[in-house]
Amino acid sequence: MSNPPAEQPAIRVTAMPADVNFYGDIFGGWPMSMMDLAASNVASRRSAGRAVTVAIDAVSFHLPVHVDDELSVYARVTSAGRSSMEIATEDWQRDRDSERTGKVTEASFTYIAIDELGKPRPVPPERTP
């Protein structure tokens, strides 16, 4: 199995019994919602303000998630336009009782930076650390 990205995850959560489907695996919408939360954090930070999801593209599911698995969600800006940003996300699970990991889900999100009236606003130039 491959390894997760080297950077810190945007969020890390534990899959709970309330998130299972009829077959006992975690419902597919749960890892997608975790990716949206992580992408939102990254988009808001990059745009220095409010940003909203306008599209989710190319969602791929690779492995099931089970109750008690730890889910690490990685997100990064891959491009920024005048008011839009593309955010690449990956979910990686780790078995609770081992260091075994696997890529669960990946997707690309499009966010728009908006102002206090909900209108598109420019994404500021990228800041250097």
Feature locations, PLM:
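HotDog/MaoC-like acyl-thioester-processing domains
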Residues: 2-11, 66-67, 78-129
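Hot-dog-fold acyl-thioester-processing enzymes
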Residues: 1-55, 112-129
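Alpha-helix boundary/capping and short turn/kink residues
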Residues: 25, 64-65
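Short, charge-patterned binding micro-sites
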Residues: 56-64
